[in-house]
């Protein structure tokens, strides 16, 4: 454990009952005295740093620290503790619930996107990654320096911090697992300002907690990831599905889940269903060449009575770019401010029994397809006997969804509005989720915090995000952060003592 080699002090201790204005003044003075760089209020930079990814959920921070060093992070945490404001790390700022801004007004935001260095050890192939690096920058550096990679999502602007600490699924996950599975150690600033290393051998309880619920226990100042050799070829593909009526949805989905459960999807294949009101497709990225893809996918095509509508072979970075939906990949500019207005929900489920599948299909056709906003549903082929995600032992970290049968599909339900989000919009996705969960045992479904749903209350959110791991997480929270310095509305609660 490394204690901060400096002290910080506000002019006066600010009580918990002090006004927001008094706390802002106190945190400003404390950060100034500690020489922590900050974002000036009412500046253009403040507008960017305080902007949410979800425009539906803007919040006003008490202050924004923009550290350039680990010592700055430590000092910022100590200032928050002394003044009595909650602190939240913000890596890329893509939280669907604006948790990087605190999920409410009045928090200290520790804006990490100025700390984005990535280095690769040429002998061990371990990547050292600062917490503000975005996925596109990481992918670019690892490939350019050594043709290496680790498994992560497809959006280049997403920050590594929240993404990897809470899962991190993408088009290499069926082959290589989640981003969280590639973390070998991390340097973490705790609520008392100390800097500790967490790994299998150092602070193992913290390391376990970080790998699935990391934002609750501290601010990661540096990650170390193992990497794999990027394959020389990957192949993107699309298959149009005739899911235009509920019977076709039931038939096609049923065939797909049987194929997945029975080991038909090889490890090299990564796949999702992408559906909206206008079309439904299977999309994916095969880790191999086009010829190998066509051979591997032929049994599924026969089951679905379908054909490949698109096949493109790429090198690794071209494959990443294909599904990035972004012209820019190597993003390091702190001025990056992509945003949308939306509501989103998630699910992780087992295979769907016939009655649930029929209810979900009916909702899709009769309700969802009549909604004329820009909604979509993504159904990721997540589990099954060949999935690297569910091959990880359940106790390896606090990430909860590792059963190859009970955790077969990962869903993102996303409803975007191009104006103010309508008051009746929430019922649309809530109803769709209920169509799934109404017929499933609670052990057969959960939710994924990287698609956070702010409509859940705190107790429900903790339960569906962490399931069997919640009690242990609460005990570790009590040990490391009993006063909940690292708080947001769905944060893990400390265990009662």
Swiss-Prot record:
Secretion signal span: 1-16
UniProt-listed Gene3D superfamilies: 3.30.465.10, 3.40.462.20
Entry's cofactor comment: Binds 1 FAD per subunit in a bicovalent manner.
Binding site for substrate: 154, 272, 412, 451
Alphabetically ordered keywords of this record: Disulfide bond, FAD, Flavoprotein, Glycoprotein, Nucleotide-binding, Oxidoreductase, Secreted, Signal
Keyword set includes Repeat: no
pH dependence: Optimum pH is 7.
Subcellular compartments: Secreted
Sites carrying sugar chains: 42, 117, 192, 233, 245, 289, 307
InterPro entries according to UniProt: BBE, FAD-bd_PCMH, FAD-bd_PCMH-like_sf, FAD-bd_PCMH_sub2, FAD-linked_Oxidoreductase, Oxid_FAD_bind_N
Chain positions of cross-link 6-(S-cysteinyl)-8alpha-(pros-histidyl)-FAD (His-Cys): 94-155
Example of a GO cellular component annotation carried by this entry: extracellular region
Catalyses which reaction(s): D-xylobiose + O2 = D-xylobiono-1,5-lactone + H2O2; D-xylotriose + O2 = D-xylotriono-1,5-lactone + H2O2; D-xylotetraose + O2 = D-xylotetraono-1,5-lactone + H2O2
EC number: 1.1.3.-
Gene Ontology MF terms in the entry: FAD binding; oxidoreductase activity
Recorded family membership: Belongs to the oxygen-dependent FAD-linked oxidoreductase family.
Protein name according to UniProt: Xylooligosaccharide oxidase
UniProt source species: Thermothelomyces thermophilus (strain ATCC 42464 / BCRC 31852 / DSM 1799)
Lineage of producing organism: Eukaryota, Fungi, Dikarya, Ascomycota, Pezizomycotina
């Amino acid at each position: 454990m490394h204690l901060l080699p400096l002290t910080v002090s506000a002019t006066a201790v600010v009580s918990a009952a002090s006004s927001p204005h008094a706390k802002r003044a106190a945190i400003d003075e404390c950060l100034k005295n500690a020489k922590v760089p900050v974002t000036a209020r009412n500046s253009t930079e403040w507008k960017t740093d305080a902007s949410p990814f979800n425009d539906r959920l803007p919040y006003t921070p008490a202050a924004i620290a923009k550290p350039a060093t680990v010592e700055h992070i430590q000092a910022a945490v100590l200032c928050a503790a002394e003044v009595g404001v909650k602190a939240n790390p913000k890596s890329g700022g893509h939280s669907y619930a604006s948790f990087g801004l605190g999920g409410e007004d009045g928090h200290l935001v520790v804006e990490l996107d100025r700390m984005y260095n990535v280095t690769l050890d040429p002998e061990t192939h371990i990547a050292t990654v600062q917490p503000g690096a975005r996925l596109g920058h990481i992918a670019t550096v690892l490939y350019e320096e050594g043709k290496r990679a680790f498994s992560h999502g497809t959006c280049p602007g997403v920050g590594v911090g929240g993404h990897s600490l809470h899962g991190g699924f993408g088009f290499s996950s069926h082959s290589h697992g989640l981003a969280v599975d590639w973390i070998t150690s991390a340097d973490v600033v705790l609520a008392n300002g100390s800097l500790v290393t967490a790994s299998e051998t150092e602070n193992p309880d913290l390391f376990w907690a970080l790998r699935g619920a990391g934002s609750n226990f501290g601010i990661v100042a540096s990650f170390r990831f193992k990497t794999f050799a990027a394959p020389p070829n990957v192949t993107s593909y699309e298959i149009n599905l005739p899911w235009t009526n509920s019977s076709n949805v039931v038939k096609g989905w049923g065939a797909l889940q049987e194929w997945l459960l029975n080991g038909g999807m090889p490890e090299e294949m990564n796949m999702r269903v992408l559906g909206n009101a206008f079309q439904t497709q299977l999309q994916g990225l095969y880790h191999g060449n086009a010829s190998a893809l066509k051979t591997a996918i032929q049994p599924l095509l026969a089951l679905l009575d379908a054909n490949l509508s698109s096949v493109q072979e790429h090198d690794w970075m071209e494959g990443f770019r294909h599904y990035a939906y972004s012209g820019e990949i190597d993003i390091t500019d702190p001025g990056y401010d992509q945003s949308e207005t939306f509501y989103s929900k998630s699910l992780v489920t087992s295979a769907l029994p016939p009655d649930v599948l029929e209810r979900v299909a009916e909702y899709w056709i009769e309700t969802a397809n009549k909604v004329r906003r820009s909604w979509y549903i993504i159904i990721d082929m997540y589990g099954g006997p060949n999935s690297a995600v569910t091959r990880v032992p359940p106790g390896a970290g606090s990430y909860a969804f590792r059963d190859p049968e009970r955790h077969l599909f990962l869903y993102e339900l996303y409803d975007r509005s191009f104006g103010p989000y309508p008051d009746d919009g929430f019922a649309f996705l809530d109803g769709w989720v209920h169509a799934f969960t109404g017929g499933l045992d609670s052990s057969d479904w959960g939710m994924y915090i990287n698609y956070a749903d702010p409509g859940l209350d705190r107790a429900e959110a903790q339960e569906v995000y962490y399931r069997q791991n919640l009690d242990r997480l609460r005990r570790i929270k009590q040990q490391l952060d009993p006063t909940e310095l690292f708080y947001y509305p769905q944060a893990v609660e400390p265990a009662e003592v």
